[in-house]
Amino acid sequence: MNTSSILLVEDHAGFAKALLNMLAQNPNLQVVAVAESGEAALRYLRESRVDLVVLDYSLPDMSGVALLEKLQAEYPDLPCAMLSGHLSLQHARRALELGARGYMIKDDPLGILNGLPRILRGEIYVSEELRSLGSSDLQADLM
């Protein structure tokens, strides 16, 4: 597998740094830029190409959902994965309906580390912890 470039959209510097350190464990994943807002991410993508956008559900200037909608409209072939601090099947379902290829919980580092390569291979990935919640109907919808 070639090295895949990632744009991380995350406004919490401490979490972004921790995620960068964790992703450095996989030589096939390279975070090429960190954007602290949705607008910064859009500006970056106007100038540069990446293989994957990993975006926070909550950003200071717009919601992650609003950014995801813009990304899907402007870059429909660009895979996006949503990160969230909330265990919410409703949020996950909404993100996936809008085109996200993954929904991962921030406090599940192993899930993030395992999920990103799967998303890059074209799979849909939802954190195991999130899939274990809710009814079987909701779980089926997420799969």
Give residue spans per PLM region.
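Conserved acidic carboxylate
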Residues: E10
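Acidic, metal-coordinating helix/loop segments flanking the phosphotransfer/catalytic sites
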Residues: V34-L52
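Acidic catalytic/metal-coordinating carboxylates
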Residues: S37, S63-A66
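Active-site residues of response regulator receiver
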Residues: D56, S84
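The feature encodes the CheY-like receiver
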Residues: P60
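Short amphipathic alpha-helix used as the core "switch/output" element in two-component signaling
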Residues: V65-D77
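Short, flexible helix-to-coil linker/hinge segments that flank and couple to helix-turn-helix
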Residues: A92-E97, D107-M143
